[in-house]
Curated annotation (Swiss-Prot):
This is ATP-dependent Clp protease ATP-binding subunit ClpC. Residues 417-452 form the UVR domain. SUPFAM superfamilies: Double Clp-N motif, P-loop containing nucleoside triphosphate hydrolases. The lineage of its organism: Bacteria, Bacillati, Bacillota, Bacilli, Bacillales. It comes from Staphylococcus saprophyticus subsp. saprophyticus (strain ATCC 15305 / DSM 20229 / NCIMB 8711 / NCTC 7292 / S-41). Keywords: ATP-binding, Chaperone, Nucleotide-binding, Repeat, Stress response. It holds the Pfam family ClpB_D2-small.
Length: 820
């Protein structure tokens, strides 16, 4: 905080506040201690104003001790609470509004009056201080010396009226203390000062990615000028931020824009102490250049070359390349200063420097752990933006979330409010019906409820103190999870159990295939526990095996268990990428081709849902060039689309399915469904499939995959379990039409027998159920049989399927009840 601008008396107030906090054994300096500090300076304007309202030091001490009392023995250094920081900030704002150069006790009092939360505000309320009158009294006590300051300031900048109307004076804003501190950019600021001190072409341009802090460097220069931390050549200079949009705005006729810009240049030249800062420098090119008129860049070129105009520009790398570099004459007048993205460690230091501002604004405490977490998590999971901007945004939003959460009215208060409203309506109705005795009772009840509400509200406000609210790592994790969809909060007990039992969850949908389910579950657990390689996807797998054994179903089951729905899976059918030219559809069409603006089918989906299961189905059907694209996804966890955007695959599970080798197996006719030699047969199947896989795909592709899993053929027992699962699904569908079905074990055995085919896995079962159950049921429904509300029992007597329709027990009971 900028304590350097405080008067001696105001500094003594802060010292008294610290003494009072120590006396009361409090661990922090809050608004109440600032108020006590003001009362300890009886000669100050603040104490005199409060005295006119009969507020004395004794009364304030009594109220403070009554509200918060004495604490335990305090340990360690004292720190200002977020609300106290906010009061100091508000007092500086009051001084600025009154055009005072220093902050006195009167400004601190105005800050306390404006801060309508905290202990000091409650003291004022308890002592019946009229806030509006107190403020007016302070302004009256000050008299109006600010007018002379205002006039002096107007005269000071009177020689640049046009510039003042179009630009912001960063040095004045820096003097007021409203600019955020600039941390860790000494090297860049020094380079800017060196370029500005040249004789000609003294125009630095700050080039860097969006959000790395280019504008902050210009603000840092303004602060350095205010603090006299610059060479003699720059002392007394004004840094003026010019917005080209403001210059162009309102210039209706030809020549108006040029005249306005020329006037600004003349004022800068005559003043001799102005450094122009143009954010978004590329807007110079073409600005005001309609219908053949000269644009802003060409008007400025002569002055920039001769050194008559000192200009700092700021623009992104892309805009500099597109707009500035193509105009060689403009480019040579600017000296590029590269602004690199800060490291995570530098970002943490920047966040620590900004902490006071955000604590004061949100009135919460921000822990060191939250700052470290914001820098690290934003760097790791928000890949399309740059530090420190994304980390600062994360802290800001998380603080806002915590602040709002702590100020939400509790349910018990809302309930009492509703009761009061209900009683009020009943009372009005009773009065309207001339039931005065009932109305009197309701009035008493309303009074009692209102008193209860006041007590509950007071208790809530006493316990809900923003100074005790703090921002934690967990809050940061919640916000970034909301941004990206990636779960980053601490693993709670429920989720821990779910992850540990993931195999059981997957086996509810996928029968058999223990190896595949275990391998996938381990990869998900590693990722959620934070142990996976941060530069690679969560897991990448190739599922091999004959058709119909559950390869695609396992991917669907994983998507449902991770996200709660099958739709969370991104499915890419590789049969659509059989031609060489179709490969570009994954990352987007090249420039000049139809669909370039639409983005890639794969990259766009992953950009929108970075935490997902990606299924590449039937990969052997795709053109070999597809696998060249997947190499860097599997190894580095990212892919660049046709627009140059980097798409992050580090939080995806990549599953590729293939039937390669299935034909070879069919030809060799291995034994498949159980038996004594099932283990030996599986090993033979595995060897055959791996051999075929190595023939079909390149070694550098296979070497990047985490695990290659060969699925087992399905046994008869497993097929029977699948029949049960399919029947359950059919039962659920029919229950929507109020039809119950039950299938006997004999019927299930027959369905499994009819759907048994070693070569095609479980898919023939679907056809068997359609043929034996669904077709006959649909005929029963359409044939006029009223089977709604009835039970259909499906059995097999050894020759054919039997359908026994009976009244449901529950519907029979309902019928009896309605008749009685």
């Amino acid at each position: 905080m900028l304590f350097g601008r405080l008067t001696e008396r105001a500094q003594r107030v802060l010292a008294h506040a610290q003494e009072e906090a120590i006396r009361l054994n409090h661990s922090n300096i809050g608004t109440e201690h600032l108020l006590l500090g003001l009362m300890k300076e009886p000669e100050g304007i603040a104490a005199k104003v409060l005295e006119t309202f009969e507020i004395t030091e004794e009364k304030v001490v009594e109220e403070v001790e009554k509200l918060i009392g004495h604490g335990q023995e305090q340990m360690g250094a004292l720190h200002y609470t977020p609300r106290a920081k906010k009061v100091i900030e508000l007092s500086m704002d009051e001084a600025r509004k009154l055009h005072h150069n220093f902050v006195g006790t009167e400004h601190i009092l105005l800050g306390l009056i404006r801060e309508n939360e905290g202990v000091a505000a409650r003291v004022f309320a308890n002592l019946d201080l009229n806030i509006t009158k107190a403020r007016a009294q302070v302004v009256k006590a000050l008299g109006s010396p600010e007018m002379s300051n205002k006039n002096a300031q107007a005269n000071k900048s009177n020689n640049t009226p046009t510039l003042d109307s179009l630009a912001r004076d960063l040095t004045v804003i820096a003097k007021d203390g409203t600019l955020d501190p600039v941390i860790g950019r000494d090297k860049e600021i020094t380079r800017v000062i060196e370029v500005l001190s040249r004789r000609t072409k003294n125009n630095p341009v700050l080039i860097g990615e969006p959000g790395v802090g280019k504008t902050a460097i210009a603000e840092g220069l303004a602060q350095a000028i205010v603090n006299n931390e610059v060479p003699e050549t720059l002392k007394g200079k004004r840094v003026m931020s010019l917005d080209m949009g403001t210059v162009v705005a309102g210039t209706k006729y030809r020549g108006e824009f040029e005249e306005r810009l020329k006037k600004v240049m003349e004022e800068i030249h005559q003043a001799g102490n102005v450094i122009l800062f143009i954010d978004e420098l590329h807007t110079l090119v073409g600005a005001g250049g309609a219908e053949g008129a000269i644009d802003a860049s060409n008007i400025l070129k002569p002055a920039l070359a001769r050194g008559e105009l000192q200009c700092i520009g700021a623009t992104t790398l892309d805009e500099y390349r597109k707009n500035i570099e193509k105009d060689a004459a403009l480019e040579r007048r600017f000296q590029p200063v590269q602004v690199d993205e800060p490291t995570v460690e530098d970002t943490i230091e920047i966040l620590k420097g900004l902490r006071d501002r955000y604590e004061a604004h949100h009135r919460i405490n921000i822990s060191d752990e939250a700052l470290v977490s914001a820098a690290k998590l934003s760097h790791r999971y928000v890949s399309d933006r740059f530090l420190p901007d994304k980390a600062i945004d994360l802290i800001d939003e998380a603080s806002s979330k915590v602040r709002l959460k702590s100020h939400t009215t509790p349910p018990n208060l809302k309930e009492i409010e509703q009761q009061i409203e209900q009683v009020k309506n009943e009372k009005d109705a009773a009065v309207h019906a001339q039931e005065f005795e009932n109305a009197a009772n309701l009035r008493d009840k309303q009074t009692k409820l209102e008193k209860q509400y006041e007590e509950a509200n007071t208790n809530w406000k006493n316990t809900q103190n923003g100074d005790n609210t703090s921002l934690s790592e967990e809050d940061i994790g919640e916000v970034i999870a909301g941004w990206t969809g990636i779960p980053l909060t601490k693993i709670n007990e429920t989720e821990s159990d779910r992850l540990l039992n993931l195999e059981d969850t997957l086996h509810n949908r996928v029968i058999g295939q223990k190896d595949a389910v275990t391998s996938i579950s381990k990869a998900v657990r590693r990722a959620r526990a934070g142990l996976k390689d941060p530069k690679r996807p969560i897991g990448s797998f190739i599922f091999l095996g004959p058709t119909g054994v559950g390869k695609t179903e396992l991917a669907r089951a994983l998507a449902e268990s991770m996200f709660g729905e099958d739709d969370a899976m991104i499915r890419v059918d590789m049969s659509e990428f059989m031609e060489k030219h179709a490969v570009s559809r994954l990352v987007g069409a090249p420039p000049g081709y139809v669909g370039h603006d639409d983005g890639g089918q794969l990259t766009e989906k992953v950009r929108r849902k970075p935490y997902s299961v990606i299924l590449f189905d039937e990969i052997e059907k795709a053109h070999p060039d597809v696998f060249n694209i997947l190499l860097q996804v599997l190894d580095d966890g990212h892919l660049t689309d046709t627009k140059g955007r980097r798409v992050d695959f580090r939080n995806t599970v990549i599953i590729m399915t293939s039937n390669v080798g299935a034909q070879e197996l069919q030809d060799q006719r291995f034994a498949g469904f159980g038996g004594a030699t099932e283990g030996q047969d599986y090993e033979s199947i595995r060897k055959t499939m791996m051999k075929e896989l190595k023939n079909a795909f390149r070694p550098e592709f296979l070497n990047r995959v985490d695990d290659i899993i060969v699925f087992h053929k399905l046994s008869k027992d497993e097929l029977k379990q699948i029949v049960t699962m399919m029947v359950n699904k059919l039962t659920n569908r029919l229950s929507e039409q109020d039809i119950n079905i039950s299938v006997t074990e004999a019927a299930k055995e027959k369905i499994a027998e009819e759907g048994y085919d070693p070569e095609y896995g479980a898919r023939p079962l679907i056809r068997a159920i359609q043929k034996t159950v669904e077709d006959n049921l649909s005929e029963l429904i359409l044939d006029g049989n009223q089977i709604e509300g009835k039970e259909v029992k499906i059995d097999h007597d050894g020759k054919e399927f039997k359908y026994d329709i009976t009244e449901r027990q529950d519907s029979a009971k309902d019928k009896e009840t309605s008749e009685s």
